[in-house]
Amino acid sequence: MKNCFIFSGQGSHRPGMSLNLYNTFQIAKDRIELSNKILGYDISEIMFSAEENVLRQTQYAQPAIFIHSTILFDLIKDQKECVAVAGHSLGEFSALYANNFFDFETGLKIVDVRARAMHECELNYPGKMSAVIGTSIDKIQSICDSVDCQIANINSDSQIVISGSEESIDLASKSLKNIGSKVIPLSVSGAFHAKLMSDAKNKLIDIINTSRFNEVCYPIVSNFNAKPNISIESIKDALIEQIDNPVQWSKSIKSLSKLSSEFLEIGPKKVLSNIIKKIDDSLTITTYNSIENL
């Protein structure tokens, strides 16, 4: 059966990521050494040796996850048939590499611009994110509107992530707890997929509009609208819009499940499988995150 390939996003990093791949496969060694040249700094040192508090920083985590995910994809692509792709936030860029939308160098350059721009927003507009469990999206939206924060991820019907300034998230969290919600602060460094990322969006527009893209091989279900996209222009627009709009993950999985019930999760860590099972427990999910899975 053909598979839906899905790629994890920021938060799926892990110290030592890609080191075993680098030491085992020539394609991994070549890819990582090329990445050092493209980025202009030693990303391999950060991936292989950096502590968690360094690797998790947006400007390093995003390129590192993209590099790792694309290596894994290239190692398994001839073994599995694909019917469609998707990625969670940053993972959408790995999905587009797998879909022939851009070559590796183009993809990494775009991811680097995105990561640096988002990191700059983190510094200029401090914010945070929290997961909300067990409350309807309508109630969450109403509270967010009242304190000026946003819904950032709709991961499943029972897990919604909110994003905004530190003050607005504190106020929203208090109100949500008062109505019985479980609120879990996330270990992230900024207010992703919210209007505090609007400056980063402008920088992403510039590089996307000056980059070369190819026709895709399969539909990509985009975070922004959860619809299968195949046209270059619609894919570009969705990439730009997702940076300060909610990740429609639950709807994306439901859209993909119409194409196949077999999913492959690709990324440094198993993070999407449990979320997907909460959306539709009939789906079969295989994870590729390290050399042990190959």
Tell where the protein language model's regions lie, with residue ranges.
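Alpha/beta catalytic cores of group-transfer enzymes, especially the acyltransferase/condensing modules
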Residues: 10-12, 39-41, 100-244
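A short, acidic, amphipathic alpha-helical segment used as a generic capping/interface helix at domain edges
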Residues: 244-260
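NAD(P)-dependent dehydrogenase/reductase Rossmann-like domain
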Residues: 207, 212, 246, 258, ...
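Glycine-rich phosphate/pyrophosphate-binding beta-alpha loops
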Residues: 61-63, 191, 246
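Short, hydrophobic/aliphatic alpha-helical segments
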Residues: 1, 76-78, 177-180, 252
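FabD-like malonyl-/acyl-CoA
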Residues: 1-139, 263-291
